[in-house]
Amino acid sequence: MALLNSATLEFVRSHADEDVRHLAFLADRFPGVDMPAALDQIRGRQVAKVKIPAWAAVDGIVYPPHLSLEQCSGEAAARYKARLVRRLGVQSLVDLTGGMGVDFSWMAREVSQATYVERQEWLCALAKENFPRLRLSHVEVRQGEAEALLPALP
């Protein structure tokens, strides 16, 4: 998790299964820890264990704040969309509303070339961190408005 400093990363790993509401009261004891980021990561992994268990099983996945995680597709829906892509028999894919990248991460496995587009820079940063951890080496991440990027997309 390159987006987190080493103290925060260690805190996240050490307290992964604890109640974030309780941990929030311990911020003064851990001055080197970016507590809001740590709590986002801990809570994110806890939600992912239920919603996207395959992601939760991968060490180092970086999770967004709670709202983005709540709005993303679950693993079952993402796998279903990947089956649809497989049935289409296409070789390339462009996701114009990348978001957290859950749907994209499964659909991209079904094609030889995949492009993730997202207007929010911080979600693109998360995607660039997470996709290699998910063994997606044939993907491209582009930040910007879909309408502006469309003419240059494959």
Label every PLM stretch briefly.
Residues 1-154:
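SAM-dependent transferase fold signal centered on methyltransferase-like domains
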